[in-house]
Swiss-Prot record:
Gene coding for it: clpP
Main localization of the protein described in the UniProt heading: cytoplasm
Catalysed reactions, as listed in the record: Hydrolysis of proteins to small peptides in the presence of ATP and magnesium. alpha-casein is the usual test substrate. In the absence of ATP, only oligopeptides shorter than five residues are hydrolyzed (such as succinyl-Leu-Tyr-|-NHMec, and Leu-Tyr-Leu-|-Tyr-Trp, in which cleavage of the -Tyr-|-Leu- and -Tyr-|-Trp bonds also occurs)
Lineage: Bacteria, Pseudomonadati, Pseudomonadota, Alphaproteobacteria, Hyphomicrobiales
Subcellular location: Cytoplasm
Annotated protein name in UniProt: ATP-dependent Clp protease proteolytic subunit
Cysteine-cysteine disulfides: none
Quaternary structure annotation from Swiss-Prot or TrEMBL: Fourteen ClpP subunits assemble into 2 heptameric rings which stack back to back to give a disk-like structure with a central cavity, resembling the structure of eukaryotic proteasomes.
């Protein structure tokens, strides 16, 4: 598996040049969109990328604690604890966080998608959403393996409780839905309660 940080660092990131009274300023495209309060989760959820997203959330809250943040998600999931650090920060800050799935939101990606501001959780028409229980592997002494198995069970219960909170489904329904890889269309995810709307086009701005 390629290191996601190497992939990002070696990628050709478009630059945006702006003119001002002080001359030209160049921004990479993600920094420019951050000025518009747009942040991204692209690729696997892991510690370094999660810390960048947490930092962006905290920065935008410090700039304006009442203004909406748009969080675009295209992720196959990844490390549970990394995802939970993003989740907890989304719940912690005062800004409402709108979530939008483009491409896919699987595993921890789906949890972050459904954790957005109620009424403001969206997916594009061809997005795919997948939920399942956490998985992990461990080698070592039998006692340590049992300890890790209990930890995975505890994480499974906690993740189920988070889905219950944000979907409005009862615990047994969530438990059953997450027992195996459960792929959904955007419409099915809306019916299940993971998102609020499937959107094809950006809404027109309200008339002044």
């Amino acid at each position: 598996m390629r290191d996601p940080i190497d992939v990002y660092n070696n990628a050709l990131v478009p630059m945006v040049v702006e003119q001002s009274s002080r001359g030209e300023r160049a921004f990479d495209i993600y920094s420019r969109l951050l000025r518009e309060r747009i942040i991204f989760l692209t690729g696997p959820v892991e510690d370094y990328g999660a810390s960048l997203i947490v930092a962006q959330l905290l920065f935008l809250e410090a700039e304006n604690p009442k203004k909406e943040i748009s969080f675009y998600i295209n992720s196959p999931g990844g490390v549970v604890t990394s995802g939970l650090s993003i989740y907890d920060t989304m719940q912690f800050i005062r800004c409402p966080v709108t979530t939008l799935c483009v491409g896919q939101a699987a595993s921890m990606g789906s949890l972050l998608l459904t954790a957005g501001e109620p009424g403001h959780r969206f997916a594009l028409p061809n997005a795919r959403i997948m939920v399942h229980q956490p998985s992990g592997g461990f080698q070592g002494q039998a006692t340590d393996i049992l300890i890790h198995a209990r930890e995975i069970e505890a994480l499974k219960r906690r993740l189920n409780e988070i889905y219950v909170k944000h979907t409005g489904r009862d615990y047994d329904t969530i438990h059953t839905a997450l027992e195996r890889d459960n792929f959904m269309t955007a419409d099915a995810a809306k019916e299940f309660g993971l998102i609020d709307e499937v959107i094809e086009k950006r809404p027109e701005p309200a008339a002044a």
